[in-house]
Amino acid sequence: MAASSSLVPDRLRLPLCFLGVFVCYFYYGILQEKITRGKYGEGAKQETFTFALTLVFIQCVVNAVFAKILIQFFDTARVDRTRSWLYAACSVSYLGAMVSSNSALQFVNYPTQVLGKSCKPIPVMLLGVTLLKKKYPMAKYLCVLLIVAGVALFMYKPKKVVGIEEHTIGYGELLLLLSLTLDGLTGVSQDHMRAHYQTGSNHMMLNINLWSTLLLGAGILFTGELWEFLSFAERYPTIVYNILLFGLTSALGQSFIFMTVVYFGPLTCSIITTTRKFFTILASVILFANPISPMQWVGTVLVFLGLGLDAKFGKGAKKTSH
């Protein structure tokens, strides 16, 4: 993908990355819901899929295989000199962010978690400035704030209070803060690889997923989840087909994500991945004629305003040439 992307004109590269991420993860989301929320079996013996670690493990394996194929056919000339510890650190921070974000839902409500995750570009930018001494134009800061505010407003849906919701105050917010910090560290690691080692997108994708596979593999063996999953798959073999498709859409989506990181940096990647969910919901609203509240219209305007201003005035971050 990295090699083939050189055939794409510069002006089309960013739209290609955005569309690639959007289309792949749109179908990825459908498959994810089908796998994790579907009912298996009949009558009183119906079961649900509860093997989250195994699902992510298979996803990482498919990603790694896909990246290896891309390197073999399109990227053989590139020599990867990136330090292994950087890949390991990146995979640890990525997995940690994902686990922290999901665990936070035990202590905070969904809107709070969404608001936290929508702020992902902020730690990427802050850590990039503080640790890497990277400079962004003021317009970039304003555009990121507009986009984050727009996505948060669009996705926020106040619930009607039916009873008293109690949860431990502070712990959930701490987990979200940890998740955001780890997201930022992942972005800093990727930025460091780009700046000092000119790491290719395919090599980045391969090695981060290999390390993630190693960590998750140890996890599912230690917990015994792997054997429970194999027993489940034996009872419902169609799950294997859906999981493989799920892994393939993830691999394609990740190849576009890593290509975005290499050519445009982790901040732009964060903007794309943050707004992806917004556009997915927007497409759902258009296709199924779901109503949009005034607050969501404000969010829509802010996101498109932020994206438009960023395209026109937000340039200025130094890019690695390939």
Curated annotation (Swiss-Prot):
Gene Ontology molecular function: any one: UDP-galactose transmembrane transporter activity
Q: What is the annotated localization of this protein?
A: Endoplasmic reticulum membrane
The reactions it catalyses are: ADP(in) + ATP(out) = ADP(out) + ATP(in); UDP(out) + ATP(in) = UDP(in) + ATP(out); UTP(out) + ATP(in) = UTP(in) + ATP(out); dATP(out) + ATP(in) = dATP(in) + ATP(out)
Q: Which domain of life is it from?
A: Eukaryota
Motif (Di-lysine motif) on chain:
318-322
Q: What is known of its domains?
A: The di-lysine motif confers endoplasmic reticulum localization for type I membrane proteins.
Q: What's this protein's family per the entry? A: Belongs to the nucleotide-sugar transporter family. SLC35B subfamily.
Name this polypeptide is given: Solute carrier family 35 member B1
Species of provenance: Bos taurus (Bovine)
Source lineage: Eukaryota, Metazoa, Chordata, Craniata, Vertebrata
